[in-house]
């Protein structure tokens, strides 16, 4: 998308959610998570496709989503039971990180779209959250409850942020294993600058790395963090069928990092 159109889309998004965020800046009361049977793995798709997208086309309202953008083909949804977490979800039927559509050369840059929506999280925290403490994650097939791609936009855990502060991106021009565990798991890192993040299909980089290692995409889990000025670190964990690795563990949806 040309930068001018991306800027228009982002400005529309900002304007569309200001009213919704205004009330959230007061106090957030979070209901307890109910004890429920195994989740319907199509529930998120039904919400976004049947309610948010169709409702928007009929009435112009986004509910129950926060925003629907047909130009970019995405919706933003406030995660249930978490005070600050948002999800970016494609309007197209894309099952998850393993979906071949993600690595097509003309595929939508959903990761950068998610990063552009980080202000939804920071606004709920009175803009007290530095960008370096925002993390994007995608879980593997065997560590998720939904079979519609959703990118978690949330706060970094304090331990994750502390570990990533010591990263020298010049050491990660190619894939390299981090010297320490993150969330008790081993991750590999690849540094990208803002221009590459915005213009490059990082899902293609992930696919090439995972297949070169003889692993399966459905077991891959990824995260993206802003570790320095104009520098991001793409993180990859290659789990197995029996030992899934959920990148979401690098996040803290209560955003305790802002309260320490």
UniProtKB/Swiss-Prot annotation:
Q: What is its EC number?
A: 3.6.1.26
User: What cellular component GO annotations does this protein have?
Assistant: plasma membrane
Keyword Cell membrane in record = yes
What does the record give as the reaction this protein catalyses? a CDP-1,2-diacyl-sn-glycerol + H2O = a 1,2-diacyl-sn-glycero-3-phosphate + CMP + 2 H(+)
Tell me how this protein sits in the membrane.
Answer: Single-pass membrane protein
Q: Which cysteines are joined by disulfide bonds?
A: none
* Cellular localisation: Cell membrane
Top-level division of the source organism's lineage: Bacteria
Q: What is this protein called?
A: CDP-diacylglycerol pyrophosphatase
């Amino acid at each position: 998308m040309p930068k001018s159109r991306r800027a228009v889309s982002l400005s529309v998004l900002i304007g569309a959610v200001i009213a919704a965020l205004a009330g959230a800046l007061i106090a957030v009361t979070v209901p307890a998570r109910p004890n429920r049977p195994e989740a319907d793995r199509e529930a998120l798709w039904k919400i976004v496709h049947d309610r948010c997208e169709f409702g928007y086309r009929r009435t112009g309202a986004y509910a129950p989503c926060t925003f629907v953008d047909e130009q970019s083909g995405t919706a933003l949804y406030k995660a249930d039971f978490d005070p600050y977490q948002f999800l970016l979800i494609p309007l197209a039927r894309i099952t998850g990180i393993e979906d071949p559509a993600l690595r097509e050369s003309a595929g939508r840059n959903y990761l950068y779209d998610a990063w552009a929506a980080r202000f939804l999280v920071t606004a709920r925290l009175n803009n007290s959250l530095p960008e370096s403490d925002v993390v994007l994650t995608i879980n593997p097939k065997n560590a998720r409850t939904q079979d519609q791609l959703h990118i978690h936009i949330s706060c970094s855990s304090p331990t994750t942020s502390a570990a990533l502060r010591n990263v020298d991106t010049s050491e990660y021009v190619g894939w390299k294993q981090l010297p320490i565990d993150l969330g008790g798991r081993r991750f590999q890192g690849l540094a990208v600058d803002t221009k590459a993040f915005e213009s490059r299909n990082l899902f293609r980089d992930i696919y090439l790395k995972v297949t070169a290692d003889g692993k399966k995409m459905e077991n891959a889990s990824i995260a993206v963090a802003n570790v320095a000025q104009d520098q991001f670190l793409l993180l990859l964990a290659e789990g197995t069928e029996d030992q899934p690795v959920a990148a979401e563990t690098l996040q803290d949806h209560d955003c305790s990092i802002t309260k320490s």
